[in-house]
A protein has these predicted regions:
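Compact, glycine/acidic-enriched structural inserts
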Residues: 108-144
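A short, terminal or domain-edge coil/loop segment
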Residues: 71-79, 108-109, 142-149
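A surface-exposed partner-binding patch
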Residues: 1-102, 164-180
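Intrinsic-disorder-associated interaction segments
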Residues: 1-5, 120-124, 150, 154-161
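Short alpha-helical interface elements
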Residues: 57-58, 64, 68-73, 111, ...
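A short local loop/turn or secondary-structure capping micro-motif enriched for an aromatic residue
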Residues: 104-106
Length: 180
């Protein structure tokens, strides 16, 4: 276990803020995009290349920086995980994009990891919706460049997504009532 990994897992257990390495400063995001064959000019590519990034291996969360970020450790030269973690969130939580269909999420769906429960919870939004949220309060467009490197707190995201989902639920109810 590297010192960074130990610090990261200790912080996870203590429910405190996570340490992350700046993907833009060390080129880690570009390495991750290349390892997962994500086009750098796609919406996901823009976010990965300009956001903080963490990987998951063997059921444990690991923190890497620079060229180590998605270092390969298998004979068949595959990345550590089918999950790609995004975001440095100050009150101790991470978001991830599922890269395959799993029991808890479909491919491309965003999940939320709560350090309190250490469980992944599907958020009911896909990658595009997550990126729209990440960029909508800023001047950049979806095809623009991530300038600030900031990401809002999970509370702010949860509030935003809850409001959006409530609105969609109300619209669905109105449509159902109108059809009846």
């Amino acid at each position: 276990m590297t010192p960074n990994t130990k610090i990261f897992t200790d912080l996870l257990r203590e429910n405190r803020a996570f340490l992350t390495v700046s993907a833009t400063e060390y080129g880690a995001g570009r390495n991750a995009a290349e390892a997962f064959r994500i086009l750098p000019d796609s919406m996901l590519g823009v976010l990965v290349c300009h956001c903080e990034t963490v990987s998951c291996a063997g059921g444990l969360l690991h923190l890497y920086g620079g060229g180590q970020l998605f270092a390969r450790n298998t004979k068949d030269n595959k990345p550590f995980s089918e999950l790609l973690f995004l975001g440095d969130l100050a009150d101790g939580s991470l978001f991830t994009v599922s890269r395959i269909d799993t029991a808890i999420a479909k491919r491309g769906e965003v999940l939320f990891l709560s350090p309190g429960t250490l469980n992944f919870e599907p958020m009911g939004i896909d990658t595009a919706e997550f990126i729209r949220w990440a960029l909508e309060s800023r001047e950049e467009t979806l095809k623009g460049v991530w300038l600030t490197g900031e990401i809002l707190s999970p509370r702010a995201l949860k509030k935003h997504i809850t409001a959006k989902l409530d609105l969609l639920d109300r619209l669905d109810m109105l449509k159902t009532e109108g059809d009846a």
